[in-house]
From Swiss-Prot:
One of its GO terms (molecular function) is actin binding. Promotes EGF-induced cell migration by displacing tensin TNS3 from the cytoplasmic tail of integrin ITGB1 which results in dissociation of TNS3 from focal adhesions, disassembly of actin stress fibers and initiation of cell migration. Suppresses ligand-induced degradation of EGFR by reducing EGFR ubiquitination in the presence of EGF. Increases MET protein stability by inhibiting MET endocytosis and subsequent lysosomal degradation which leads to increased cell survival, proliferation and migration. One of its GO terms (biological process) is protein localization. InterPro entries: PH-like_dom_sf, PTB, PTB/PI_dom, SH2, SH2_dom_sf, Tensin_PTB, Tensin_PTEN_phosphatase. It comes from Bos taurus. Residues 214-228 have a biased composition (Pro residues). It holds the Pfam family SH2. SUPFAM superfamilies: PH domain-like, SH2 domain. Coiled coil: none annotated. This is Tensin-4.
């Protein structure tokens, strides 16, 4: 391998380091043995240590000789070469050892993939080339000979021990803008607190026959076609099938890469399979990189070449900090600004590759494998976001996320032009996007469904002939500051339940919408959220029924045939008999008028009330008139809760003949009252006095309706 990259994805350790590039070819030592010096850094199969930065140590043996590890768990072999020094004896031993290693490697690969082309051993390989400055210069001038790939190393119990120096190799980044590169390169400038305890290490290397040469930092971008499939290395703790503990076979054929899933028990217990597809969570996390490479990278390869694992990718990339990203344009979606985890510095804003993609919080950032659709206050995804795109793969799905206060991700707006739009996937939000009402539509049609001044009976009349789902929101007459919801529900399942002559009023159900500092809420439905306004409540329930019997249907015209909110007395007495009227009024007192009735009874009751030494304290009530009589509801529950006076007991209703006004605890208001038969004394009448409470709700409507009902001979 040419580079061992730092990564926050390794368990227990901050990063995996790389030897400083003071020497052009220096790599890591194998696992420790008693013959090695104590300060020599090494890999183990048990886990990564507390510190992950590995530093090179001077080799005690010949400069060009490999130091093999006697332990069976050592899965990595390294080369250590001093610049400008070549010992012939050591070189011969090195060549023989490399030939033996290649033979073991070929045997292992042939067991997995018989179609693999063997790597020929011999001194003619790249490992026998002298490390002269002219050779390095030639390599720098011929970067097209490189075929950089990405390599995945997974280990659940690897440990990297401390080293005296940190890695600062400048050759960590491959040729800038090269379209051949298909891998991900991680930066080592990761702060200690941003490193995770996951199991994925990603680094790059050039395709060679035995030894991997480092990619020169000053290399020129290559113009070759796309590279071959990626190289995957199983975890350090996996069982090996070859001698000398070589348990990391290089996979260079598509069939072998596909066979990794079937060979899982033999190769690795938990292989981290990362996805570079545009809709995967990796592209979101890596989109918050500190530096984004050239945006004009050509996209030729499909994202289906990289394996995917929902259980590994989300956990290994959850707390990823600012990293250097190098990948294909077709395999990446770049969020313009993202904050993957708390406590990390905000990543530098990167130029997007394109302009079109849905806005969503990736699953890996929110510690969830699926995005839970949360409808906004308007019950509709964010305007301007296209429908979700779906690419092949078990995990590559992104819904158009609805940004809400419960989402910890501040912004993950990704953009992509390389993928065609796919039809939106089904979501539990109900109808499709073009069928869902927007907040603006709900507010524009509020004049049809919000009738604050109508009564319960008027709402029933308006909804009587409407389809199920029709509704009206009005001011509650029983609970001050709350709202009443009248909803037309589905028809009864059995017609036998309907009574003869039924007017379908039983199909209209009434609900109370409470209003508080938290917002409006459907009373008695603990599972329902609080909404900031009635429009938000209506919009959400027009998408999802939630606790209601059915979804609300937003009206686009006046309910009840055109003028549901018209004055009941506009068309004369016949129209009044079919309607009901109501208003808020100040209840003053009830005075016995003996056998008097009519206007004289009202005049006498008002005079007796005003002549008192202490005037009564008025209370706000809802005065409602229907075909059944008059119903009084104490809004504040001060004097009574509710009183009903049947139509048969009513005698008269009218204003004060002397036009006197009530002025205590309110502005001057006209006084009116109605005379009804006493409920205790059958021979006496009682006059109930009121004062107008709101100029927008005059008492003239209820007075005219009571007069019309009293003059109807059939209802007396």
């Amino acid at each position: 391998m040419s580079q061992v990259m730092s990564s926050p994805l390794l368990a227990g350790g901050p990063a995996v380091g790389l030897a400083p590039c003071e020497e052009p070819r220096r790599v890591l030592h194998p696992a420790p043995s008693p013959s090695l010096p104590p300060p020599c850094p090494y890999y183990t199969t048990e886990g990564w240590g507390a510190q992950a930065l590995m530093a090179p140590m001077p080799c005690k043996g010949p400069p060009g000789r490999l130091q093999p590890a006697p332990q069976a768990g050592a899965n990595a072999s390294c080369l250590l070469k001093a610049p400008g020094e070549q010992v012939s004896g050591a070189q011969e031993d090195l060549d023989s050892y490399i030939d033996f290693s290649l033979e073991s490697l070929n045997q292992m690969i042939l067991e997995l993939d018989p179609t693999f082309q063997l790597l020929p051993p011999g001194p003619g390989g790249p490992e026998a080339q002298p490390t002269q400055s002219t050779t390095l210069g030639k390599k720098k001038e011929e970067p097209e000979a490189l075929d950089i790939k990405y390599i995945e190393v997974t280990s659940t119990r690897s440990r990297c021990h401390d080293g005296p120096r940190s890695c600062c190799s400048p050759s960590v980044t491959p040729p800038f803008g090269s379209p051949r590169t298909g891998g991900l390169l991680l930066s080592r400038d990761l702060p200690r607190e941003t490193r995770s305890s996951s199991e994925s290490l990603i680094f790059s290397g050039s395709q060679g026959r035995g030894h991997q040469h480092p990619a020169p930092p000053s290399a020129v971008p290559s113009s070759h076609p796309p590279t071959s499939p990626s190289i995957s290395i199983p975890g350090m703790g996996s069982k090996a099938s070859g001698p000398h503990g070589l348990g990391s076979p290089l996979v260079a054929s598509p069939s072998l890469e596909k066979g990794l899933g079937g060979q899982g028990p033999q190769l690795s217990s938990r292989v981290s399979m990362l996805s570079g597809s545009p809709a995967s969570d990796i592209s979101y996390v890596f989109g918050s990189s500190q530096s984004l490479l050239h945006s004009s990278i050509s996209s030729h390869q499909s994202s289906s070449r990289s394996l995917e694992s929902p259980s590994s990718s989300s956990s290994s990339l959850n707390n990823l900090g600012p990293v250097s990203l190098y990948t294909r344009a077709s395999d990446l979606q770049v969020p313009s600004n993202a904050t993957p985890s708390m406590g990390q510095p905000r990543a530098t804003r990167s130029p997007p590759l394109a302009k079109e993609h849905a806005s969503s919080c990736p699953p890996s950032i929110t510690n969830s494998m699926t995005d839970i659709p949360i409808v906004l206050i308007n019950g509709f995804p964010e305007p301007g976001s296209p429908p979700s795109q779906r690419t092949p793969g078990p995990q590559d799905f992104v819904r158009p996320g609805a940004t809400s206060s419960s989402m910890p991700c501040p912004a993950t707006r990704s953009h992509s032009q390389t993928l065609p739009e796919a039809p939106p996937t089904a979501s539990p939000e109900g109808p499709a996007r073009d069928m869902q009402p927007t907040m603006k539509f709900v507010m524009d049609t509020s004049k049809y469904w919000f009738k604050p001044s109508i009564s319960r009976e008027q709402a029933i009349e308006l909804l009587r002939k409407e389809e199920p789902g029709a509704f009206i929101v009005r001011d509650s007459s029983s609970y001050r500051g709350s709202f009443g919801l009248a909803l037309k529900v589905q028809e009864a399942p059995t017609p036998a339940q309907s009574r003869p002559g039924e007017d379908s009023s039983d199909l209209i159900r009434h609900f109370l919408i409470e209003s508080s500092a938290k917002g409006v809420h459907l009373k008695g439905a603990d599972e329902e959220p609080y909404f900031g306004s009635l429009s938000a409540f209506v919009c959400q329930h027009s998408i999802m029924a939630l606790a209601l019997p059915c979804k609300l249907v937003i009206p686009q015209k006046e309910l009840g045939g055109g003028d549901g909110a018209s004055d009941p007395s506009a068309d004369g007495q016949a129209s009044c008999l079919k309607k009901s009227a109501g208003c808020h009024a100040l209840y003053l007192s009830s005075v016995s008028v003996e056998t008097l009735s009519g206007a004289l009874a009202v005049e006498k009751a008002i005079s007796a009330t005003l002549e008192r030494d202490v005037l009564p304290t008025p209370t706000v009530v809802h005065f409602k008139v229907t075909e059944q009589g008059i119903t009084l509801t104490d809004v504040q529950r001060k004097v009574f809760f509710r009183r009903h006076y049947p139509l048969a007991t009513l005698r008269f209703c009218g204003m004060d003949p002397e036009q006197r006004k009530w002025q205590k605890y309110c502005k001057p208001s006209r006084i009116f009252g109605f005379v009804a038969k006493s409920q205790t004394e059958s021979q006496e009448n009682v006059c109930h006095l009121f004062a107008e409470y709101d100029t927008l709700q005059p008492a003239s409507q209820v007075i005219r309706l009571v007069g019309a009902l009293l003059q109807d001979p059939e209802r007396m």
